[in-house]
């Protein structure tokens, strides 16, 4: 999966898909009442990027629905969306409420209340393990609204670079048994080693691990892309999807990796 990083403005959806992204990451900020408010990152952000692009969350989600509905030219090119949920602005006790409000919002504006809505898979990426009740609030709301089937399209990620064992324990608390992506990374302005990504890959490949897929961020340089592929990740989050495509076409990688398609299930662990 080639994950376009920090896609917060409607025009950027086209821009990143045209460069080769089949997935995008979008930042979601919340108001004081735990409503998703803007798709916005703010400063500081990755080197070489405009940190201030934004939309109202509802407007972005409606545009995303259009892009990921059959009949749209992007439909079979963009099929995974990571919502990077900026919950650090919320009190811990608001996490469940944020999950409820996010679910209601996506149900209405993205899934069109279950009536021919957007088809992309969604990952809820949460920066704080203490906010695991966002997941339970989200799940319960879709069930209460009569749309438990939409949870088939939803996965989870804790993005705080916590110890993998602690992440697994938190999923157990939340009752999550699958649909788990694990991120690891750092801004493109800095370097980060592969110790934790290797631990995440080991969990993914072990019999009793909870992780289904692993992705690394933010990978912009050619050598960093090669090093990341050598770590056997499933996804690369990048500001330059065209560079990822270029490296995947190199002899060393083109037989080992392929770019995911709509038919690939992002919740299935790949077995060699």
UniProtKB/Swiss-Prot annotation:
Active site residues according to the UniProt entry: 5, 41 (nucleophile)
GO CC terms, sorted: extracellular region
Entry keywords, A to Z: Cytolysis, Dermonecrotic toxin, Disulfide bond, Hemolysis, Lipid degradation, Lipid metabolism, Lyase, Magnesium, Metal-binding, Secreted, Toxin
Tissue: Expressed by the venom gland.
The keyword Lipid metabolism belongs to this UniProt entry's keyword annotation: yes
Chief localisation class: secreted
Disulfide bonds: 45-51, 47-189
CDD domains xrefs: GDPD_like_SMaseD_PLD
Cross-referenced InterPro entries: PLC-like_Pdiesterase_TIM-brl (IPR017946)
Biological classification of the source: Eukaryota, Metazoa, Ecdysozoa, Arthropoda, Chelicerata
Single GO molecular function: metal ion binding
Reaction(s) catalysed by this chain's protein: an N-(acyl)-sphingosylphosphocholine = an N-(acyl)-sphingosyl-1,3-cyclic phosphate + choline; an N-(acyl)-sphingosylphosphoethanolamine = an N-(acyl)-sphingosyl-1,3-cyclic phosphate + ethanolamine; a 1-acyl-sn-glycero-3-phosphocholine = a 1-acyl-sn-glycero-2,3-cyclic phosphate + choline; a 1-acyl-sn-glycero-3-phosphoethanolamine = a 1-acyl-sn-glycero-2,3-cyclic phosphate + ethanolamine
Coiled coil spans: none
GO biological process, one term: killing of cells of another organism
Residues annotated for Mg(2+) binding in this entry: 25, 27, 84
Stated role: Dermonecrotic toxins cleave the phosphodiester linkage between the phosphate and headgroup of certain phospholipids (sphingolipid and lysolipid substrates), forming an alcohol (often choline) and a cyclic phosphate. This toxin acts on sphingomyelin (SM). It may also act on ceramide phosphoethanolamine (CPE), lysophosphatidylcholine (LPC) and lysophosphatidylethanolamine (LPE), but not on lysophosphatidylserine (LPS), and lysophosphatidylglycerol (LPG). It acts by transphosphatidylation, releasing exclusively cyclic phosphate products as second products.
Assigned protein family: Belongs to the arthropod phospholipase D family. Class II subfamily.
E.C. no: 4.6.1.-
Cofactor remark from the record: Binds 1 Mg(2+) ion per subunit.
Cofactor (UniProt): Mg(2+)
Location of the protein in the cell: Secreted
Name of protein: Dermonecrotic toxin LvSicTox-alphaIC1bii
């Amino acid at each position: 999966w080639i994950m376009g990083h920090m896609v917060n403005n409607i025009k950027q959806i086209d821009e990143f898909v045209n460069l080769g992204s089949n997935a995008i990451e979008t930042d979601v900020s919340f108001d004081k009442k735990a409503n998703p408010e803007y798709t916005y990152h703010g400063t500081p952000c990755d080197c070489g990027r405009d940190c201030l692009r934004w939309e109202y969350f509802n407007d972005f989600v409606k545009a995303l629905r259009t892009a990921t509905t059959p009949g749209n030219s992007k439909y079979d090119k963009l099929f995974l969306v990571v919502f990077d949920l900026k919950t650090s602005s919320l009190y811990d006790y608001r996490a469940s409420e944020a999950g409820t409000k996010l679910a209601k919002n996506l149900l209405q504006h993205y899934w069109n209340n279950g009536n021919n809505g957007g088809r992309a898979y969604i990952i809820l990426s949460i920066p704080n393990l203490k906010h695991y009740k966002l997941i339970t609030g989200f799940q319960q709301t879709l069930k209460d609204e009569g749309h438990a089937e939409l949870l088939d399209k939803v996965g989870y990620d804790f993005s705080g670079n916590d110890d993998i064992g602690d992440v697994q324990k938190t999923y157990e608390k939340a009752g999550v048994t699958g649909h788990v992506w694990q991120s690891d990374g750092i801004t493109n302005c800095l370097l980060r080693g592969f110790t934790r990504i290797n631990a995440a890959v080991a969990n993914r490949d072990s019999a009793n691990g909870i992780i289904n897929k692993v992705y690394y961020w933010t990978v912009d340089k050619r050598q960093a892309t090669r090093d990341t592929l050598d770590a056997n990740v499933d996804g690369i989050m990048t500001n330059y999807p065209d560079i990822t495509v270029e490296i995947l076409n190199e002899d060393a990688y083109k037989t080992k990796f392929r770019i995911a398609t709509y038919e690939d299930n992002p919740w299935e662990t790949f077995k060699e």
